[in-house]
Amino acid sequence: MNEFYIGILYIVPTPIGNLSDITYRALEVLKDVDIIAAENIRHTNILLQHFNIKNNLILMNKDNEKKQSHNLIQELKKGKKIALVSNAGTPIINDPGCILIKQCHIFDIKVIPLPGACAAITALSASGIINNRFCYEGFLPSRKKSRCDLLHSLKEETRTIIFYESKHRILESIKDIIEQIDKNRHIVIAREMTKKWESIYGAKASLILEWLKENKYRYKGEMVIIIDGFKKLKNYTLSKKILDTFSILRKFFSLKTSVLITAQIHDINKNKLYQYVIKKEE
């Protein structure tokens, strides 16, 4: 391993479920640093014991982050090497540590991030949703009004949207997505990533809700919600004749069947017609 610099903070990702996912470099750093700043001592000890690593752990969580950051800066100024870890995944993503890193930059203390696990990116990679542009929104608010306000503000967000959600609120959150964004918007639920009961399921929001309700075990564990971005209908208009045809058919047939027949009669793109009419029917 390369020589450590003097006074360095290492950002060390840890596995999000499968302990085999930890990197060799992460293990080397955890062995060789002077201090490991952990979000949860007991949780991190389980990881260290699994890999036969013994080191000095101190607690840094959201409750003591400000005070502990000051203490750690003093240690770093003395030339100590410190590893920052969270309960799982890459630190700072919904975890404490940002204050410490900011202070490191202020005092010109080197910060070295290690690449590694992140539930949001892991889920996104397997979602099948176009992901060249995406926004990460963290955990959905626990209060319904705040959650609905946020979802409504993202109704026409063209980028793929990523949320974390708990098993306790997943059903209510999917209902709010249907209400505030679109019942027909494609979403993916990625559950228990890298763990034994990992599952990834994608469908329209309304179908996702039905799928979850079919089996209570489908909404157990930690969830990542991925929402397809809003698709704008650019310069797409329909003639009165086409709309009249659709309106007549809609009185007798389902939305899908009415769209299909109308598209065949007028030789137009059924997908564009479908997107157009569902917006009108909302």
Curated annotation (Swiss-Prot):
InterPro entries: 4pyrrol_Mease, 4pyrrol_Methylase_sf, 4pyrrole_Mease_sub1, 4pyrrole_Mease_sub2, rRNA_ssu_MeTfrase_I, SAM_MeTrfase_RsmI_CS. One of its GO terms (cellular component) is cytoplasm. Keywords: Cytoplasm, Methyltransferase, rRNA processing, S-adenosyl-L-methionine, Transferase. One of its GO terms (molecular function) is rRNA (cytosine-2'-O-)-methyltransferase activity. CDD domains: RsmI (cd11648). This is Ribosomal RNA small subunit methyltransferase I. It comes from Buchnera aphidicola subsp. Acyrthosiphon pisum (strain APS). Belongs to the methyltransferase superfamily. RsmI family. It is found in: Cytoplasm. Its main location: cytoplasm. Catalyzes the 2'-O-methylation of the ribose of cytidine 1402 (C1402) in 16S rRNA. It catalyses: cytidine(1402) in 16S rRNA + S-adenosyl-L-methionine = 2'-O-methylcytidine(1402) in 16S rRNA + S-adenosyl-L-homocysteine + H(+).
